[in-house]
A protein has these predicted regions:
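N-terminal beta1-alpha1-beta2 submodule of the flavodoxin-like/Rossmannoid cofactor-binding fold
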Residues: 2-112, 160, 171-315, 376-426, ...
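Gly/Ser/Thr-rich helix-start
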Residues: 24, 86, 92, 130-131, ...
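Mobile beta-alpha loop/short-helix "lid" or hinge segments that flank ligand
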Residues: 48-53, 146-175, 253-258, 349-378
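Short, glycine-/small-residue-rich phosphate/pyrophosphate-handling segment
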Residues: 114-162, 320-365
């Protein structure tokens, strides 16, 4: 893998943060760091302090856990992209890693962790044992930060052979003697891909003076058409994207998505939008999905629509995506239905980028980091706060989609809400953290 040379001011900054007790996660983290460095990133390879294992375990892996500097919340602030690597314990992240994540709360409260791109890796004793749950748990923290989450590369044949986990890399515990070259190569590729996406994250200098391009960002808003409340929120989401100069397609998934041509809503109101098709997703740079929540899950017609898309790489691959919901009660799917949609989006290769807490509108509407939500128990139509939140979600979809796309069209006019520090300030910070990755000094 050849290195990509960049000016230091434009090099993406990647932090690979790991917890390892048997060496498996350490080896994957080193490989991910090598991959990111080869893509021109400045890399920090950092460990989480382990104060949990018993004496025998301490002796076993004390050596491997002292060769890299200890991660701090400031490393999350420094990074444009993060690889989070933890073993699976009881279907969740390890306790030391969870303590590290919790330690970022003060920076999160100041709005300093938004708009990073995050991916994750894990390992377990057996083929299942909670690997998926661990990766998804890590991503919930990332969404609270306001990050974009990058799952597995569904176009990489090596990933399919290594774990076939759409949420990230998950492997079996292995001793150094049993190390799988395929696992290591896949981790290296995941680090390289993370660096490529980290290079597209916003910094003040590039958002304040965008370069001219050929045309506006494209946003498709797809909603379940049965209920007026969902339709109104979809219209507001589309309006938010248009405010930033995006081209928008507002599309519906009728109740009974497999009916040819689709059935129109039977409720009163303006005419329904055109039926959604695969081409509407292929056209878009970003997609927002809206649905009723039924029994804590997204409505079956929307799930049906998504499940008819090609498995693996398809029209959502590498595109920004998020969702909003309407629920019967405040806690009858306002989070679980959104997370379920996110899980579906990973299977399509999307970059899942919900609002998080990147704008006051999210707090005013109830503080749901996973997407906008309205409970029908609060009124038949969305509240002003819910409308403002979903309008902002449309704006955010346009901006993130604009940053992620590879084609040259005009960027949206307004930056993502949230504070990003001057990237030049951190370049001289803690120079003792320099590590050597793949024969190159990276910090």
């Amino acid at each position: 893998m050849t290195s990509t040379r960049r000016h230091p001011a434009t090099m993406p900054r990647v932090a690979v943060i790991y917890h390892s007790r048997r060496g498996t996660m350490l080896r994957l983290a080193v490989a991910a760091a090598e991959g990111a460095a080869a893509r021109g990133a400045r890399v920090r390879l950092l460990r989480v302090v382990d104060d949990g294992p018993g004496p025998s375990q301490r002796r076993r892996h004390a050596a491997v856990d002292t060769e890299h500097s200890v991660a701090s919340p400031e490393d999350v602030r420094w990074a444009d992209g993060l690889v989070l690597a933890t073993p699976t314990y009881f279907g969740n992240v390890s306790a030391p890693f969870k303590r590290f994540l919790d330690s970022t709360a003060r920076l999160w409260a100041r709005g300093l962790l938004a708009d990073r791109v995050v991916t994750a890796m894990t390992s377990a004793e057996c083929d299942y044992g909670g690997r998926e749950a661990t990766l998804l748990s890590l991503y919930q923290t990332a969404w609270h930060w306001g990050s974009w989450v990058l799952g597995a590369d569904l176009t990489d044949p090596g990933h399919a052979r290594a774990s076939s986990n759409p949420y990230g890399l998950s492997v079996n515990y292995r001793s150094e003697e049993q190390e799988s070259a395929l696992d290591v190569d896949t981790a290296r590729a995941q680090g390289a891909r993370l660096a490529e996406f980290a290079a597209r994250t916003p910094r003040p200098r590039c958002l304040s003076s965008p370069r001219p391009m050929r045309g506006p960002a494209r946003v498709t808003v797809v909603h379940h058409a049965l209920h007026d409340t969902v339709r109104v929120m979809a219209q507001e989401c589309a309006a938010g994207a248009r405010e930033l100069g995006a081209e928008v397609r507002l599309r519906r998934v009728p109740d009974g998505a497999t009916v040819p041509g689709g059935a129109r809503s039977t409720v009163k109101g303006p005419p329904s939008a055109l039926p959604a098709t695969k081409r509407d997703l292929e056209w878009a740079d970003a997609v927002v999905f809206g649905s009723l929540a039924r029994l804590g899950a997204p409505a079956a017609p929307l799930v049906d629509f998504l499940q008819q898309l090609p498995e693996g790489a398809g029209p959502l691959t590498d595109k920004a995506a998020s969702s909003f919901v309407v629920t019967p009660q405040p806690h009858a799917g306002s989070e679980s239905a959104l997370l379920a949609i996110h899980h579906l989006l990973f299977h399509g290769g999307a970059v899942v980028a919900p609002p998080g807490y990147t704008d006051p509108a999210s707090f005013a509407a109830g503080g749901n980091p996973y997407g906008s939500a309205h409970a029908l128990s609060h009124g038949a139509l969305p509240s002003p706060a819910a409308l403002e939140a979903v309008r902002y979600q449309g704006q955010r979809a346009a901006v993130v989609g604009d940053l992620l796309r590879r084609t040259d069209r005009a960027p949206c006019r307004l930056p993502v809400s949230g504070t990003r520090e001057d990237p030049h300030i951190e370049h001289t910070r803690r120079t003792d953290r320099t590590h050597h990755i793949a024969g190159k000094a990276t910090s």
